[in-house]
């Protein structure tokens, strides 16, 4: 029986990976607090503390790993020593430019390189922006202020990422591949808000957030180099996240999920 460990198992993507692995063998759900996750054995551990998670890899065949942790090469070395045979890395589509001067691109590229050099079988997932980012609108009233309101993105349902990850974790045929994953169409924030409003039966309206206000607000929640990275992506034109690929339907044998489908599933969060 295959044993799979999902790191970041309580996150938007990690939780979907756990759900998609139902019936595929033993699933271990690693999170900082060891929060119980349906269908998995909970484990507590922080990936920023290599020693604290060293025992977690024992008896594990495959690992789902989000990019960006401080010592990814060290984590991978411990996995290899423990006998892990396959790693599926959650990266980003932004790496395609290979721009190491961009902080977001850089930490994902570093993680990708570490996985490729680890000696473990690997698959890299490079998704577009997540539909679940709309959950940030939940605490707001019927007027939503949104940065980069004029930038279309082919947003993807994390459930589709989870389904592809589950396949990569259990199917050696996807080893050695970097998979660009997107939703079925490129949409503007106002388009997505309109769909959400229809699903909720509310008259929701989007107000573009001025760049200076967006920069200040984002800067209160993340390091300045990451704020700069997003402005370089969406104002500097360094990353086109509107391109649609067929990877999800090609691998899953069904269409990629729409934002309406995502909204119907998550309507209760609003």
Predicted features, each with a name:
Residues 2-33, 37-38, 48-51, 58-60, ...:
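Oxidoreductase cofactor-interface core, primarily capturing Rossmann-like NAD(P)-dependent enzymes
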Residues 62-65, 89:
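Redox-cofactor binding/interface segments in oxidoreductases and associated redox assembly factors
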Residues 43-46:
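Cofactor-binding loops of NAD(P)H-dependent oxidoreductases
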Residues 212-270:
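A hydrophobic C-terminal alpha-helical subdomain
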Residues 52, 130, 257, 261:
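Residue-level recognition of oxygen-bearing side chains
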């Amino acid at each position: 029986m295959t044993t799979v460990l999902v790191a970041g198992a309580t996150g938007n993507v990690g939780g979907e990976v756990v759900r998609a692995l139902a019936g595929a063998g033993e699933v271990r759900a690693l999170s900082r607090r060891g929060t119980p996750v349906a269908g998995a054995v909970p484990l507590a551990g922080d990936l920023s503390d290599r020693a604290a998670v060293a025992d977690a890899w024992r008896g594990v065949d495959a690992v789902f790993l989000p990019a960006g942790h401080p010592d990814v090469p060290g984590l991978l070395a411990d996995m290899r020593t423990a006998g892990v045979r396959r790693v599926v890395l959650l990266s980003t589509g932004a790496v395609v430019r290979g721009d190491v001067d961009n902080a977001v691109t850089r930490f994902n590229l570093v993680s990708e390189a570490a996985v490729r050099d680890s000696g473990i079988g690997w698959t890299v997932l490079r998704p577009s922006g997540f539909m679940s980012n709309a959950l940030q609108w939940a605490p707001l009233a019927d007027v939503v202020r949104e940065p980069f309101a004029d930038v279309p993105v082919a947003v993807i349902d994390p459930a589709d990422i989870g389904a592809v990850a589950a396949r990569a974790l259990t199917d050696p045929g996807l080893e050695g591949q970097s998979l660009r994953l997107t939703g079925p169409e490129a949409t503007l924030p106002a388009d997505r808000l309109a769909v959400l409003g229809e699903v909720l039966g509310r008259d929701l309206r989007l107000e573009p957030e001025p760049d200076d206000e967006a920069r200040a607000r984002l800067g209160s929640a993340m390091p300045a180099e990451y704020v700069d990275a997003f402005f370089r992506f969406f104002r500097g034109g360094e990353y086109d996240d509107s391109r649609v690929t067929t990877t999800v339907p090609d691998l899953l044998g069904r269409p990629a999920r729409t934002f309406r489908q995502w909204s119907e599933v998550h309507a209760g969060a609003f």
